[in-house]
Design a protein with these regions (language model features):
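Active-site metal-binding motif and surrounding structural segment of the metallo-beta-lactamase
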Residues: 89-138, 241-252
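Active-site neighborhood of divalent metal-dependent phosphoester bond hydrolases
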Residues: 139-166
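Short amphipathic alpha-helical segments
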Residues: 96-97, 121-123, 147-148, 221-222, ...
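Core dinuclear metal-dependent hydrolase active-site scaffold
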Residues: 1-100, 166-247
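Short, hinge-like loop/turn segments at secondary-structure boundaries
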Residues: 102, 150-154, 226-227
Length: 276
């Protein structure tokens, strides 16, 4: 297969590839030897985080093709406990840079099963305790199905590694006194975005983690009045738009653009206190 301008690649066997450019051949073996690990493509400086009553740590803003930044993710600190929002590639590298050990993690909130939000689950499986796996049943089902296929394990074995905590879609759920609301978000695979809220010594605090989302323009072009045609209704579009523009104290947005990510201009009139 030609990649670009005379550079060809072919797959020889599992994780073994041969590149050809003007008669020069290079073989690349991506298989790992025992105890060998893939290196992270980006360096991260070390940070000292505080274990606050309620805090949000920005731990990534890239996508699955980004060689310079960790994938879109956040870390919630609540009452001193550590919760991840998604577990992407090189999650251990990110945690080490923040001074967080895998064995310190209380739970992980899952948005969806795309690799850049999912690939780090195998790292969490090796913790010395069952980390709480927090998601709606629909998201959990897609993740378990994919993980079982990739890791060659039975689907029922998922509960051997994680403590499953199901969330009710579109409702406020109590997770160890932290209120969490998963909201369905249009995306190529089943996806929920999250609202978090609590009350601390200052007052009510809220955080919105919106990854992954779709742009209003893409959704608008899908509107149809014909129920027999693929697409969405005007009512559905209005509902999604209203939820995307929910007012919170801090909102972290996926604005990667294109057909499957959000657009920054959609939030130019967002009523939230701070957008990231």
């Amino acid at each position: 297969v030609e990649i670009k301008k005379g550079l060809f690649v072919r797959r020889l066997r599992l994780n073994l590839f041969e590149f050809n450019y003007q008669g020069d051949y290079v073989t690349v073996d991506l298989n790992l030897m025992p105890h060998e690990k893939y290196e992270s493509p980006y360096p991260l400086g070390f940070q000292n985080i505080s274990r606050d009553y309620f805090a949000v740590i920005h731990s990534g803003e890239g996508n699955g093709w980004d060689i310079n930044r960790p994938c879109m993710s956040s870390i919630i600190v609540f009452q001193g406990d550590i919760y991840l929002i998604d577990a992407g590639p090189n999650i251990l590298h990110s945690l080490n840079a923040l001074g967080i050990g895998v064995n310190e993690l209380e739970g992980v909130f899952q948005t969806h099963a795309h690799d850049d939000h999912f690939a780090g689950l195998t790292t969490l499986m090796r913790a010395d305790h069952k980390i709480k796996y927090i998601a709606t049943p629909l998201i959990r089902a897609t993740v378990i199905n994919k993980l079982a296929a990739l890791a060659s394990i039975k689907e029922e074995n998922f509960r051997n590694y994680f403590e499953v905590r199901d969330l009710k879609l579109g409702a406020w759920n109590d997770i160890d006194n932290l209120e969490v609301k998963p909201i369905f978000s249009p995306h190529p695979t089943e996806t929920t975005i999250y609202l978090f809220r609590t009350v601390d010594q200052i007052g009510s605090r809220s955080y919105a983690h919106f990854a992954d989302i779709s742009s209003f323009n893409v959704l608008r072009n899908m509107i149809t009045d014909d129920d027999s045609e693929p697409g969405i209704s005007q009512e559905y579009f209005d509902d999604v738009k209203s939820k995307y523009l929910t007012k919170v104290d801090l909102k972290k947005l996926d604005v990667g653009g294109g057909y499957v990510h959000g657009a920054a201009l959609d939030f130019k009139d967002d009523p939230s206190e701070k957008l990231f």
